[in-house]
Amino acid sequence: MRFTALASAILPLACNVLALPAKTGEAPKLDVSLSQVDNTLIKAVVKNTGSEDITFVHLNFFRDKAPVKKVSLFRQRYVIPLHPHFPALTSVIQPTELPFQGIKQRFRTEGLTEDALTVLAPGESIEDEFDIAATSDLSEGGSITISTDGFVPIATGNKITGSVPYSSNELSIEVDAAQAASVASAVKPLDKRTKVASCSGTRSSALSTALKNTVSLANQAASAAQSGSSSRFQEYFKTTSSSVRTSVAARFRAVASEASSTSSGSTTYYCTDTYGYCSSNVPGVHLPAYNIIANCDIYYTYLSALTRTCHAQDQATTTLHEFTHAPGVYSPGTDDLGYGYDAATALSSSQALNNVDTYALFANGKFLLSREVDVKYLHTT
């Protein structure tokens, strides 16, 4: 089934008063120390190096029990001689990031439960051990470089109110191929009987509406990225480069194309939690290795179809968020480098281009669903 026109109009959303990125020089900072425990078993020590208490959201971060991406893995850079008699003639093989085979979660920005939060006093630290072979194929063995950096959301009460930067050392390890191959994958594809499950009832209706809204949001965001306000694009992507604008627009168009049909495309979209990774804080999960998306219960109970609030979450931008993650929609898929407006707008241009929430925020910050017949322009930025 292909979707056509929306019953409602998508209009520019007024975000006239822009929140400023966090002044990360004045905020606490998290230092991550990575070490090898045994072959692919890694330990992370996360320390608050600032001078004040910090409460951060540990979903998609260290302490999360789900198989989320905590570090990036790279095959090490090396040099290949091209001629035995001319050592100066070499070919340099640059590091390549290994594909992540775990899950990525979108979590709510308000109403977070206590079990999603970690509090660290100045100088205090937490430890987390995890096996990188459970979420990446390391059966080839060899030299691997491990590191992580980005921004983690901080919370006041149960609401995300800012972000703090974190970074780690660069850890190089030698992986034993046989041991790595013996580690069970954290996520396995569903069997065929489960994959044929389909949406029905109110959830089917809600997802159909979300997909229609996603098509309109993504198409209009593509136009705005390609030829809209340069200052607005700069706000989110930290550049006005024509090549970057073209790339962003292409990803939005790919999302619109993917959302336009429920009978074809690169992703499989489930109305319910097929893997058991949902929680009261998570409206949706994505499995990038399999291009699978699944909605959680609070997608339907907590999120509106399309918000009227700038940079707030809703069903449409959550669906857009998940499609933006998927490498099958547009390769490479995006990562979770900065969550929420504060963190996303603190990223560099290259990071923003690879940050899933930057796309959702740009689409949400630019447009608004209105049931009015007359289209009114709300702002001219």
Swiss-Prot record:
InterPro entries: Fungal_M35_metalloproteases, MetalloPept_cat_dom_sf, Peptidase_M35. It catalyses: Preferential cleavage of bonds with hydrophobic residues in P1'. Also 3-Asn-|-Gln-4 and 8-Gly-|-Ser-9 bonds in insulin B chain. It comes from the Eukaryota. GO terms for biological process: proteolysis. Its cofactor is Zn(2+). Its EC number is 3.4.24.39. Keywords: Cleavage on pair of basic residues, Disulfide bond, Hydrolase, Metal-binding, Metalloprotease, Protease, Signal, Zinc, Zymogen. The active site is at E322. This is Neutral protease 2 homolog mep20. GO terms for molecular function: metal ion binding; metalloendopeptidase activity. Zn(2+) binds at H321, H325, D336. Belongs to the peptidase M35 family. Disulfide bonds join C199-C271, C278-C296. Secreted metalloproteinase that allows assimilation of proteinaceous substrates. Shows high activities on basic nuclear substrates such as histone and protamine. Residues 20-193 form a propeptide. Binds 1 zinc ion per subunit.
